[in-house]
Amino acid sequence: MTQDELKKAVGWAALDYVRPDTIVGVGTGSTAAHFIDALGSIKHQIKGAVSSSDASTEKLKSLGIPVFDANDVDSLDVYVDGADEINGHMQMIKGGGAALTREKIISALSRQFICIVDASKQVDVLGKFPLPVEVIPMARSYVARELVKLGGQPEYRQGVVTDNGNVILDVHNLNIMDAVAVENHINGIAGVVTVGLFANRGADVALVGTADGVKTVTK
């Protein structure tokens, strides 16, 4: 199976976690896009979705799925999204698509987080994939200097402005052994909106696309 076929398999497998008459949290990226396609097949069974990006919102609406503002819901039954890396503790690096802040808000709203990935995203230690940090523009240089102190090499993601109007620093060469501590530290730097480490609130279930089919991993 190609990588895209693996992504499609886990996207459709995630439908098993969607209950009727609920509002579904929907992520961003190529794997999440397959889940949105799958969601379109049961759109008359759900109330709608809360989306983590403008791109996902457009795709949901094109399929006729109602999109709700996060401020209009108290909680979500389930949130389905991909990841750039996931470790054995179900902690993740997310934000390659620059939607990390909205993704983190939706994960906080959700009772269950289903991470959908192909097997290439599974790692023992987080950090080989550059860690995205969303930063208020005026703080970019200051935050970059603080990230260097952590041992990372921050790189400004040129030409990218988030849906919130901010910029992204991608931090290379981090070997993240204590993901909770790193998440808390970076989130405490003035000017950081959020870091793309999902460690305090990790995934509850990972659906992993492999050559042998979709494997389910739980905490």
Curated annotation (Swiss-Prot):
Catalytic activity: aldehydo-D-ribose 5-phosphate = D-ribulose 5-phosphate
Residue numbers annotated as active site: 103
Annotated residues for binding of substrate: 28-31, 81-84, 94-97, 121
Keywords: Isomerase
Assigned EC number: 5.3.1.6
InterPro entries assigned to the protein according to its UniProt record, in alphabetical order: NagB/RpiA_transferase-like, Ribose5P_isomerase_typA_subgr, Ribose5P_isomerase_type_A
Major enzyme class: isomerase
GO molecular function: ribose-5-phosphate isomerase activity
Keyword Isomerase: yes
Cellular component aspect of the GO annotation: cytosol
Pathway connected to this protein: Carbohydrate degradation; pentose phosphate pathway; D-ribose 5-phosphate from D-ribulose 5-phosphate (non-oxidative stage): step 1/1
GO biological process, one term: pentose-phosphate shunt, non-oxidative branch
Organism domain of life: Bacteria
Annotated family: Belongs to the ribose 5-phosphate isomerase family.
PANTHER family found in the cross-reference section: RIBOSE-5-PHOSPHATE ISOMERASE
Subunit structure: Homodimer.
Protein purpose: Catalyzes the reversible conversion of ribose-5-phosphate to ribulose 5-phosphate.
Listed name of the protein: Ribose-5-phosphate isomerase A
Source species of the chain: Pectobacterium atrosepticum (strain SCRI 1043 / ATCC BAA-672)
